[in-house]
Regions:
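N-terminal signal-anchor transmembrane segment
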Residues: 1-41, 63-73, 367-369, 385
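Transmembrane alpha-helices of multi-pass inner-membrane enzymes
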Residues: 30-36, 174, 358-414
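Aromatic-anchored transmembrane helix interface
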Residues: 57-65, 78-101, 111-120
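Alpha-helical transmembrane segments of multi-pass inner-membrane proteins
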Residues: 110-151, 157-226, 341-344, 365-368
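A membrane-periplasm/extracellular boundary helix in multi-pass inner-membrane enzymes
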Residues: 129, 206, 223-262, 270-278, ...
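A conserved mid-to-late transmembrane alpha helix and its immediate loop/hinge
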Residues: 157, 200, 304-342
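Hydrophobic transmembrane alpha-helices and their immediate junctions
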Residues: 191, 229, 323-366, 404-405
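Long extracytoplasmic/lumenal interhelical loops at the membrane interface
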Residues: 255, 259-267, 285-323, 346
Length: 414
């Protein structure tokens, strides 16, 4: 019963970035509660798991301590709340990873994948219908039904900012691509391919330059990570998607608007660097970048593009501004450690496990590329968590199949 609850919680959390920020937070809480409940029945799972990955756990604890220290030094009136707001994803990972790795079997993961793929197809149809009614009929009919507002009037990116939504679309495309390659039914392959085509259309309409660059990088990277001809040929189509997307963006945004956008990013980057240099060791505390003022010549344009919320538009710089050199270095170490674990999963195993590992690493690469042009929101953190936990599960499955580290049951019997 608890395992089923855990599986359902993971499935809902995995698809929540497709919906909005609210569902991500709700499903994250549900997954945390389910994980704690699972670990309460077998508490040795927690220590057994993190003994193997003690360096990663130590880095998470150190990073959380850096968050707390920075907020204390800056006399944040809500120190604990601010620290929790930034470190909640690490807390979720600490409990969810051992609970899922030791409780979920290969069949359970397969069920989660196909459930997520099915829901992705449904949302793809909804989003395409919304884009059609908005662009062709000039109607917000679908958004009116759910009483939501469009964040960007030029690009039909659901109710999201187009940038985080583009990362979700890329992750969804990788998911459907994996289902296409492993499915034995021709009709399912056709359906999944149509879903990929629909998601690609939405990605083009979003006109996010970084997303197209990421797709091209993933297409090239797949050649080195996976020798399967179908995967290489499928992801090579990403090069065509990149070209079409960049062309559409050029049609949508005149050169003067592009120059303003780049000017805004350059100005914010410069002010972010200045803010970091003002408090280089421990930073300015949680969301310190919001104190950055817009350049006067870009004030109106900035408000229209970012809904009047300020950040540096670079995840790495954002961490330096908020938590100084200490927090920035620890965050970088944590991110690179997660990348190493995900890469490790991609080079082990064979067949379906090999394919899954490669797709997970490609998704981590997509998120990494995005970090140089945006600040992570709930959707990116959720995608990172699912990617990392999936990779850790693949590593543990490989250990079991090769007779490596003893399982929890074997350890208990010693």
């Amino acid at each position: 019963m608890i395992t089923r609850l855990l599986k359902v919680s993971l499935a809902l959390f995995a698809i929540s970035p497709l919906v909005n920020v609210g569902p991500v937070n709700v499903t994250a809480l549900l997954l945390l509660l389910a994980s704690v409940l699972q670990l309460s029945t077998q508490p040795q799972q927690f220590s057994l798991f993190w003994r193997q990955y003690w360096v990663f756990m130590l880095t998470m604890v150190a990073l959380t301590s850096a968050f707390l220290l920075s907020n204390l030094l800056n006399k944040n009136p809500n120190t604990l709340d601010a620290t929790f707001a930034q470190s909640r994803w690490l807390l979720l990972l600490a409990f969810a990873a051992p609970a899922l790795v030791y409780s979920m079997k290969m069949k359970d993961w397969r069920d989660v994948v196909y459930f997520s793929a099915s829901i992705t197809l449904v949302f793809t149809i909804v989003y395409l219908a919304d884009a059609f009614t908005y662009l062709k009929l000039e109607s917000n009919l679908i958004l009116d039904v759910i009483d939501a507002q469009r964040s960007d009037l030029l690009r039909p990116s659901w109710v999201f900012n187009p940038h985080p939504f583009s990362r979700t679309l890329i992750a969804a495309m990788l998911l459907l691509l994996g289902c296409t390659l492993v499915s034995n039914w021709g009709i399912l392959r056709v359906i999944f391919c149509l879903g990929i085509l629909g998601l690609g259309t939405l990605l083009v309409l979003g006109a996010v330059r970084t997303a197209f660059i990421a797709v091209a990088v993933l297409a090239c990277l797949s050649v080195f990570l996976y020798r399967g001809k179908r995967l290489v040929s499928s992801l090579s189509a990403g090069l065509l998607l990149c070209v079409v997307g960049l062309w559409f963006r050029g049609q949508l945004f005149p050169m003067d608007q592009t120059d303003k956008s780049l000017g805004l990013r350059e100005a914010l980057f410069e002010q972010g660097v200045n803010a970091f240099l003002a408090t280089p060791w421990f930073g300015g505390g949680y969301q310190a970048a919001r104190a950055i003022s817009w350049p006067s010549e870009l004030q109106q344009f900035a408000g229209a593009q970012t809904m009047a919320t300020t950040n540096t538009h670079v995840q790495w710089l954002e961490m330096l501004v908020s938590y100084g050199l200490l927090g920035g270095l620890l965050f970088t170490a944590l991110w690179l450690l997660s990348g190493w674990l995900i890469l490790k999963a991609s080079i082990q195993g064979f067949g379906t496990r090999k394919l899954a590992g490669v797709l997970l690493f490609l998704n981590w690469t997509s998120l990494t590329i995005a970090s140089f042009t945006t600040v992570y929101r709930e959707s990116e953190w959720a995608l990172w968590l699912v990617t990392l936990i999936g990779s850790l599960s693949l590593i543990e499955l490989q250990k079991k199949s090769s007779g490596g580290t003893p399982t929890l049951r074997e350890t208990a019997s010693l």
